[in-house]
A protein has these predicted regions:
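A short local loop/turn or secondary-structure capping micro-motif enriched for an aromatic residue
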Residues: 26-30, 106-109
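Core segments of cupin and vicinal oxygen chelate
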Residues: 1-24
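Generic short beta-strand segments
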Residues: 23-25, 69-70
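Vicinal oxygen chelate
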Residues: 9-12, 31-115
Length: 115
């Protein structure tokens, strides 16, 4: 795959997806690690209600990563992109971000871009 923010590969067994990414800018990768970071960047979870999960994450001390979300989505934060996907990143433990989506990602059986 090649997008404005990253290039890389998606691997899946139909249930679990792994994205191997090379970020194109520090803003998209998150400035604390930058585009040259090598290692675990984020975990993604498909959820039923992004708003409810977002509230729970923030209440647990995981703020929304507006810097990364805006770099990825520009002015379309929370709107459908990349074939209909919507995802939002939050700060997670040990600097590893948490990514949530209602529609899933390319490769997941339930991926439904709702375009």
């Amino acid at each position: 795959m090649d997008s404005p923010g990253a290039s890389g590969y998606y691997l899946t067994d139909g249930d679990i997806n792994l994205a191997i990414l090379k970020f194109k800018s520090d803003a998209v990768a998150g400035v604390e690690r930058g585009k040259d970071w090598s290692g675990l960047h984020h975990f993604g979870f498909q959820v039923d209600d992004m708003a409810a999960i977002g509230e729970r994450l923030q209440a647990a001390g995981a703020p929304k990563r507006d810097d990364v979300n805006n770099a990825l989505l520009g002015s379309s934060m929370g709107e459908r992109r990349h074939g209909g996907n919507v995802e939002v990143k939050y700060s997670g433990p040990d600097g590893i971000m948490v990514d949530v989506s209602e529609s899933g990602w390319v490769g997941t059986p339930s991926f439904n871009p709702k375009v």
